[in-house]
Regions:
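Extracytosolic ligand-binding ectodomains
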Residues: 111-608
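An N-terminal, helix-rich hydrophobic module
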Residues: 2-107
Length: 608
């Protein structure tokens, strides 16, 4: 795109490419010359005929002739007026082009970023692949989105999506969200004319945690439900006939809601910083909610950030639906505007404790150690819950000295590991924080220094990471690990092979979740964070479907009425979803999973 075109787009928010294209298709069959295009652009930017002549080093008469003989007749035709009515009157022409009803006025995406806030409908990427060709496509896509050129943005987002599928067999959920957002913006007038309502949800994820892996897992669930909801409308208006959407078209379609609506997603980066005095991300997002027409917030990831952020949303009448934070402290957060899809620490700890005690039932006594981050309210919550349930079995357990500093130096944690090894530890419960301090998860890798065949390692849901599989694989290269008796487990809310809610269960929503997930991300690449994120959006959509909520305040009241007063439930990927008055789930799901060797795929996997 030429520099002068960009000037017109950025200064005037006019789709100059569309205008020039339409001018070439008037009854005056003479196509515009490059000179004509330059004259039009400079005229729109306010230059006089003489100034244009001087700039292009031409005679003023030449500019006059091109305007009179070729440019004005074409412009007059698309405006539906006589040439004499607009000749020389660029203010009138400009007013025509800036009238949204005439189709040339661009609607650029809002600039949201500042020093303490990063958010995107498509203006920027957070998840970049190693391949630089794909990065270039992503960069071009965001440039077009910034300018409000949504068709071009859509094409480049789609090319980036296709290239990642081709190279890695896994799509980028951020690209899929931006494809959906671009389609909504590009066809906005069509949807408005047909009274299709667009709902905007903000999703707050920690891109800095674990190299963006957790954010990607959450966004897979978000982008998948966005596509599933939007495709009903895209298909109704045959949008795939005008632009190639085969790469994202669901091969098997399942309807989640009966009435066609559209879902637009704002992706927000949460720095996830434990030592920030208050949540600036939440404060800024709450301040923007009216400007952005936000209906609800999905987030945050860590319990600490969720607790700090909640008051900003509550003060604005915004519903906060949480998919990943498990601390018991969140139970008393709100009686109205908070809903939690994942399983609280108290429930997880009880399930894990029961499993551990059944595992050692035949032993006289077992030595147990707890490793966690004492700075984290989540880790403290989980640790306290585990201690409460395990102390009921004091005659069967010997509690070794605890390690509350998994977040500190590698060498200090290593020394602790060596000490409990010498003490003959039988079980370790490891509770990394939710990415608040990077050493926490990195130090969890020290488990590979233990004799894994003789010690049971039990982790919380934050321990459920691909990193653990990589560490086991690396350790397997240096010493022989018994592939049948490796003892690493975790307690999580959902798994791909869950008997009740997995890919082969009787839960139809979970079945389709896995089938579409296989198409978009490859088999088995949806995990508990993806599933609870999907369900977090689903509870919002089900209430919108029933009450046709128009505003965030109306949605808050409708969700409170439906789930907390009437005690209604819906079916989601993670099973029946019903809430207590506190916003916690009734009978939340738990699954015990273990690291096992997959002989066919020749790799370690988390499995039931």
């Amino acid at each position: 795109m030429s520099e002068i075109f960009l000037q017109v787009i950025e200064s005037l928010t006019i789709n100059i490419e569309l205008l020039l294209q339409d001018l070439d298709f008037t009854t005056n069959k003479t196509n515009l010359l490059e000179l004509d295009q330059l004259i039009i652009c400079h005229s729109l930017l306010g230059l006089s005929r003489q100034e244009i002549a001087d700039k292009l080093k031409l005679k003023s008469m030449t500019i006059r002739d091109r305007l009179s003989n070729n440019i004005y007749p074409k412009i007059a035709e698309i405006m539906g007026v006589e040439q004499k009515d607009i000749a020389g009157n660029w203010v009138k022409i400009l007013n025509f082009l800036l009238n949204p009803q005439n189709g040339y006025k661009l609607n650029p995406a809002p600039q949201l970023n500042s020093d303490n806030f990063q958010a995107s409908f498509g203006r920027q990427f957070f998840l970049y692949p190693p391949n630089q060709d794909i990065v270039k496509l992503q960069t071009e896509a965001t440039k077009f989105y910034q300018l409000g050129l949504y068709y071009q943005a859509l094409k480049y987002f789609s090319m980036a999506w296709n290239q990642e599928i081709k190279l890695y067999d896994v799509g980028n959920p951020e690209s899929l969200i931006y494809i959906n957002n671009s389609l909504i913006e590009y066809h906005k007038s069509l949807f408005q004319a047909n009274q299709i309502r667009v709902y905007t949800i903000a999703v707050v994820v920690p891109f800095y945690h674990n190299s963006g892996k957790v954010a990607a897992e959450i966004l897979r669930g978000i982008s998948q439900i966005q596509l599933q909801v939007n495709w009903l409308t895209f298909n109704k208006f045959n949008l795939d006939k005008t632009i190639d959407l085969n790469s994202i078209k669901p091969k098997i379609f399942s309807t989640l809601i009966s009435s066609p609506i559209l879902l637009k997603i704002l992706i927000v980066n949460d720095p996830n910083n434990l030592y920030t005095p208050y949540n600036q991300t939440a404060e800024k997002l709450a301040a923007l909610f009216q400007e952005l027409s936000l209906i609800a917030i999905i987030g945050h990831y860590s319990s600490e950030m969720t607790k700090n952020a909640f008051r900003f949303y509550a003060d604005k009448g915004l519903v906060l639906v949480n998919a990943c934070s498990t601390s018991n402290e969140l139970t008393d957060l709100s009686l109205m505007s908070f809903f939690r899809l994942t399983t609280p620490d108290n429930t997880n700890a009880q399930r894990l404790a029961d499993f551990l005690m059944s595992h050692i039932a035949e032993r006289e006594q077992s030595k147990i150690a707890l490793i966690y981050n004492h700075n984290s309210i989540y880790c403290q919550s989980y640790r306290n819950s585990m201690k409460k349930y395990l102390e009921a079995y004091q005659d069967k357990l010997i509690f070794l000295e605890e390690c509350g500093y998994i977040n500190e130096s590698y060498y200090r944690v290593q020394k602790y590991i060596e000490n409990i090894q010498r003490a003959g530890v039988d079980m370790i419960i490891i509770i990394p924080d939710g990415g608040l301090e990077p050493n926490s998860l990195n130090n969890a890798g020290l488990i590979s220094r233990l004799n894994l065949n003789n010690c049971l390692i039990a982790g919380s849901a934050t321990f459920y990471q691909e990193n653990i599989l990589h560490w086991v694989h690396e350790q397997n290269q240096y010493r022989d690990i018994n592939q049948d008796h490796l003892q690493i487990i975790a307690c999580i809310p959902w798994h791909w092979h869950s008997q009740e809610n997995g890919c082969n269960s009787e839960n139809i929503i979970a079945q389709y979740f896995c089938k579409l997930g296989s198409q978009l991300w490859g088999e088995g690449n949806l995990n508990w964070r993806s599933a609870t994120a999907f369900d977090a959006v689903l509870v919002v959509l089900k209430v919108i479907e029933k009450y046709h909520s128009e505003t965030s305040q109306a949605l808050l009241e409708d969700m409170d009425r439906y789930f907390k007063e009437q005690r209604r439930f819906i079916k989601g990927v993670t099973g029946n979803i019903q809430f207590k008055a506190t916003g916690d789930r009734l009978n939340p799901p738990t699954e015990i999973v273990a690291v096992k060797w997959h002989s066919q795929q020749q790799k370690w996997q988390w499995t039931i």
